[in-house]
Amino acid sequence: MLDPFSEKAKELLKEFGSINDFLNSIPRIVDVEEVIERVKIASDRKLLEGFVDIEDIKDLAQFYALLGALSYSPYGLELELVKKANILLYSERIRREKEIRPEEISLRINKAIEFPIDDLKKIERVFGKLPEYTIHLAEFLDLIPGERLSEYYIYNGNVYLRKEDLIKVWMKAFERNIEKSVNMLYEIRDELPGFFREVLGGIKEVAEQEFGKSGEVKAGTLRPDLFPPCVKNALKGVPQGLRNYAITVLLTSFLSYARICPNPPRRNVRVKDCIDDIRIITDEILPLIIEAANRCSPPLFEDQPNEIKNIWYHLGFGYTANPKLEDSGNSTWYFPPNCDKIRANAPQLCTPDKHCKYVRNPLTYYLRRLYLEGRKNASKGGNERGEKRVLQQ
């Protein structure tokens, strides 16, 4: 298996029915120890040989065991460890393969067969040999937007790639596909067997050995500059018809989880499981919700004064205007709606930016932005053993 996101891999997965069926089958195909051994490739490349030639189904089971585990901690050093180990493994397989077929890799490539006669000698002189593959220029730029095109031969809207170039582009696609898949599994993580939490525990141990610290995103002061576009739009105030969804459903759930419990261990968590003082809600979260409600046209609480009780209900305190912390659990603390639901119920709020393509929920958008910001700051600080090592391949 050259790429777990390829068409060939998708055909194998279809034999199990749905992705949920495959995930439930994984504990019967592989064990926790061999899955954890796989991520150790990141620090010991000698382990590669034990994984290069394994059977396709077993390979997919090990890989999806890691993705399922990451759904409980989608952004952190665990993600970087899984990326690094699997990029090393799959790129080595691609490197050893004599010829790459389009169905074996998650890039829309073709065999390079068309070269203008006048360019042949120049191509061989500049690149050493004729490029073997082509990819459409638009896809290339989407994956590697900052790449210098002058270093590639481009003809008829296609970028010509040698195998080493192909691997570079593939790595970018692979990283994006991992994030997308983890975000997809994030939505169903409460349905996964306990096996995946065991795997996550093992990944965390290896990550701490490899990077020397924990990279988990924790609760803290809100960063509005890192909020997703839909939340920023809701904070500006919305017209009648969108008010209840934008304020009570989206903002209430997003702001509360983002501030109190950005990476909840489960969906049925209660506010009192995460904080000891209700003033975090009354002094930090509720004012933001009320300000956004007052910016609506007309202001939400002017014609719906009881909607404040509904906000507390969505926070898990029951239908009340004056709750105490111990009331937490009287109703469900609503989780932020996913992107599909926002698009369906309030399409005006959905104005995607470049980060949105990686996520499926506004909360994971925020987690991702927080993590990337932390990684950038750590890199600036010259953290030799920590974040800088994450980026080494």
Swiss-Prot record:
User: What is one Gene Ontology biological process annotated in the Swiss-Prot or TrEMBL record?
Assistant: DNA replication, synthesis of primer
- CDD domains according to UniProt: PriL
Record text on cofactor binding: Binds 1 [4Fe-4S] cluster.
- Pfam family membership, one: DNA_primase_lrg
A GO term, aspect molecular function: DNA-directed RNA polymerase activity
Q: Which residues form a coiled coil?
A: none
Which residues bind [4Fe-4S] cluster per the record? C230, C339, C350, C356
Q: Which cofactor does it need?
A: [4Fe-4S] cluster
Region forming the signal peptide: none
**UniProt keywords, alphabetically:** 4Fe-4S, DNA replication, Iron, Iron-sulfur, Metal-binding, Primosome
Q: Which HAMAP family match?
A: DNA_primase_lrg_arc
The protein's role, per its UniProt record: Regulatory subunit of DNA primase, an RNA polymerase that catalyzes the synthesis of short RNA molecules used as primers for DNA polymerase during DNA replication. Stabilizes and modulates the activity of the small subunit, increasing the rate of DNA synthesis, and conferring RNA synthesis capability. The DNA polymerase activity may enable DNA primase to also catalyze primer extension after primer synthesis. May also play a role in DNA repair. Displays gap-filling and strand-displacement activities.
Give the similarity note: Belongs to the eukaryotic-type primase large subunit family.
Q: Which NCBIfam families match?
A: PRK03968.1 (NF003051)
What protein name is recorded for this chain? Answer: DNA primase large subunit PriL
Q: State the organism of origin.
A: Pyrococcus abyssi (strain GE5 / Orsay)
